[in-house]
């Protein structure tokens, strides 16, 4: 885990996805190319970088099955944060994204 760019990256999922009980201590905490993620009981000490994926339609499924319900773009922004602690990163000025929930300001 030495010299990694970010703590976590999620790519092209329509959810649900759960990230719980983590310590995200890198200046570049979370890169999100997805939607439908719940972040619960985490310490988040870096920047959050959100992306829309509007050039790649991907399948999504009916609940509780692997049957494909259709295809859609990832418009992002549909994430939930519950009981997290946010701190200002030490450094990370070269990291993309915003501090805490500032990344969601445009949604």
Report each predicted region and the residues it spans.
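Glycine- and acidic/polar-rich repeat regions and solenoidal domains
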Residues: 1-107
